[in-house]
Amino acid sequence: MLNKLKIGTLLLLTLTACSPNSVHSVTSNPQPASAPVQQSATQATFQQTLANLEQQYQARIGVYVWDTETGHSLSYRADERFAYASTFKALLAGAVLQSLPEKDLNRTISYSQKDLVSYSPETQKYVGKGMTIAQLCEAAVRFSDNSATNLLLKELGGVEQYQRILRQLGDNVTHTNRLEPDLNQAKPNDIRDTSTPKQMAMNLNAYLLGNTLTESQKTILWNWLDNNATGNPLIRAATPTSWKVYDKSGAGKYGVRNDIAVVRIPNRKPIVMAIMSTQFTEEAKFNNKLVEDAAKQVFHTLQLN
C-alpha cells in the first residue's frame, strides 16, 4: 500500500518566503510566492514525521500552510489531489456571499421532503417552512448539512456555475461535479470533486483574508466558521485555548478526513492551512487523530508550540 506511494520521492517540503502583499491573484488576494526548496534539518524532520504518520495511519496525507506573519509556506503533497468532501462548504458560503446581494441573505428558500438527502440535521427541521439563504449557509458550514448545501448550489446555478466562480477566483485546479452526498465517494484516481491542499487553503484565504468579499461579508463568514460544530477533534484539538480556529471539516469514503482553517493566534497575523487525507479501502474509517497529529507537527515546525 504505502510502498506504492514512493514516499521517498513524492513527499516534498517547501518553505518559502515573500511579502504577503507582494503577489496577487486575479482577484488581488495576497498569496505566497514560489521559491526553491531549502534543505534544512527542520524540513527533513518534518518530512520524516509526516512519512511516519502515513505509515502509522496507513494513509496518504496532504498539507499546505501559509503563515501570513512571516510569509513562509509549508507544504507536503500540497499539489496532489484529494477528495475535498465537506470542506468545500466554507468556500461555497463564500461564493454565495460573493455572488448574491447581501439583502438576499434574508430571502427564504422553500423546499420539500423530496429535496432532503442523507445527513440534513437542520434542513429536516424546516420542511415545508423553508430557510433563509443565511440560515442555509450557516447550516452547511456549521453543521455540514447536505441538503442545505445542495439548495445553495442550486441557488447559485448548479455545480458548473460554482466552478466558474472558483475559476474567477483564480482557482484552475478544483473540479466540482456532483451534489451531496455523491461527491464523497472519493474513489482513487477519480478527479471529480477533488482539489489540492494548496488550492483549498488559498481559496479560504481569498474569502477570509483577501479582497474578494467586503469587510461586512467577511465578518459574516468568520462568524459561521467560528461556530463550526464539527471541527473540535481536528486542527482545533492541536491548539491551545487562547488560539481561535475558523475551520471546515470534511469526511468521505476511503477514510477521507480533511480540515481547512484560518488560525488566529494572539499578537500575530493568522495562519492559513489545509490538511487532507485518504486511505486505501472504500470501507476505511476516518481518523480524527491523524489530522490532529499532522496539525501538531505543523505548529511544532513553525515553532508555535
Swiss-Prot record:
Residue ranges crossing the lipid bilayer per the database entry: none
NCBIfam families registered for this protein in UniProt: bla_class_A, blaROB
GO annotation terms (biological process): beta-lactam antibiotic catabolic process; response to antibiotic
SUPFAM superfamilies according to UniProt: beta-lactamase/transpeptidase-like
Protein name, entry field: Beta-lactamase ROB-1
GO molecular function, one term: beta-lactamase activity
Enzyme Commission code: 3.5.2.6
PROSITE patterns cross-referenced by the UniProt entry: BETA_LACTAMASE_A
Further facts: The class A beta-lactamase family has a specific amino-acid numbering system, sometimes called Ambler or ABL numbering and often misspelt as Amber. A multiple sequence alignment was used to derive a consensus sequence and then the consensus was numbered taking into account insertions and deletions. This allows use of identical numbers, e.g. for active site residues, despite differences in protein length. UniProt always uses natural numbering of residues, hence there appear to be differences in numbering between this entry and some papers.
Active-site residues, Swiss-Prot/TrEMBL: S86
PANTHER family referenced in this protein's UniProt entry, alphabetically: BETA-LACTAMASE, BETA-LACTAMASE-TYPE TRANSPEPTIDASE FOLD CONTAINING PROTEIN
Enzyme class name: hydrolase
Signal peptide: 1-33
InterPro entries: Beta-lactam/transpept-like, Beta-lactam_cat, Beta-lactam_class-A, Beta-lactam_class-A_AS
Reaction(s) catalysed by this chain's protein: a beta-lactam + H2O = a substituted beta-amino acid
Residues reported to bind substrate: K248, S249, G250
Originating organism: Haemophilus influenzae
UniProt KW keywords: Antibiotic resistance, Hydrolase, Plasmid, Signal
Record-stated family: Belongs to the class-A beta-lactamase family.
Pfam families to which the protein is assigned, alphabetical: Beta-lactamase2 (PF13354)
